[in-house]
Amino acid sequence: MDNQVYMTLLCTDDYTNGVVYLKHNLERVKAKYPLKCIVDETISKEALEVLEKNGIEWIMKDIIPIPEVIKERNKKKGVGIWNTIFQKLWIFDMTEYSKIVYLDSDIMVLKNIDELFDKPHMSCVRDSAKILKIPEWEGFTEINSGVMVIVPDKLVFKEMMKQIDKHASLPKNGTIRDICCDQ
């Protein structure tokens, strides 16, 4: 389909080079779908200019509000950056695209991955504790939201927005994984 895209998120200016590198990797492997980038008002004009200079179309979205309890929980765990990645949820609302393959901006694409567009909605990568042999990750079976295949649906997006408040009172991680795994 013509309206399929790779999508990434620029959650802070610090990841600008990662977005540019991701685009160059996709071009190097001759990906047939364009890369677009979600940004919000916290991204500087300079970072947006770098994206434009490198031919990366950016899409401005409002900041998704998350409860203070989640923000504080993430900061205490030393993962305050997780508070910005809720912006990924916008991909579920972007019905102008028939399918989105979401890639974190720090993903290294080594070969063409266009076949991901043939995968069904909510195909996600599982963290690879056994492959990497990291003992503290043993038994981890939840999704890694760094690579996802999404068929956008406004109703699903609205339901996910409701889940954010629900998860504020739960003793979980306060991550996008909590929201997606509950669907």
Where in this protein do the model-derived segments appear?
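Glycosyltransferase catalytic domains, chiefly GT-A lineage
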Residues: 1-183
